[in-house]
Swiss-Prot record:
GO terms for biological process: translation. The keyword Ribonucleoprotein applies. Keywords: Ribonucleoprotein, Ribosomal protein. The lineage of its organism: Bacteria, Bacillati, Chloroflexota, Chloroflexia, Chloroflexales. This is Small ribosomal subunit protein uS2.
Amino acid sequence: MTQGAQRLVSMRALLESGAHFGHQTKRWNPKMRPYIFTARNGIHIIDLQKTITGLTEAYQFIVETVAAGQKVLFVGTKKQAQETIAEEATRAGQFYVTQRWLGGTLTNFATMRKRLRYLNDLEDQRARGEFNKLTKAEALKLDAEIEKLNKVFGGMKTMDRLPGALFIVDPHKEALAVKEANKTGIPVVAMVDTNCDPDLIDYVIPCNDDAIRSIRLIAAKIADAAIEGQNRRESLQADVHGAGYEQEMTAQLIAREAEAVE
């Protein structure tokens, strides 16, 4: 285990979150064999050394992705993941899906973008007071439409292009999201339990994807990575702007000195 990996997450934190508990042995996917430590009382126990390694690699990838100016789409529609995914994605300034994954979200993004723009337009109209010009029934109908659209698209209504990566809780449940990401060439980072197929995932974080504490721990680390990536990007942009300013000042100084000589 590297020093950096130890700093990112401790074995104790993983154990306390229950990240090591897999599914019943009879429900396993044999492809997960390399990530399984042992079996106890009919339950597979995940090798947490592999969890730390996977999380560390995923963390670095997310940092680099966001630093390059791309966004991450967090996906977790199972009940125990919804609140955490929305909170952590929002904290990191990223996008999220916590309701049903709609087919075509990635593979038919042109249509998806139109629906997102429609939602934004409706909200803009309401903010400008245009609903006040309508009948009460018409205004209520549009309010209901906004509420309905926000429930489905609220976590990604400012997403104007495809994300640079997906972070998924339970790729077995989110099979359609994984399929669309694979088809569009978008890398997938995922919490992968013992019943999942790791071959479909670019960055496998083997762990319990059902326990709330495990989901909170891993999702928070991915959000931290996105924040670090954004900070790195802003720092780089500041350096570039600073260098440009210095070059401009130097040029002006040289010009003034040249004028003085003349």
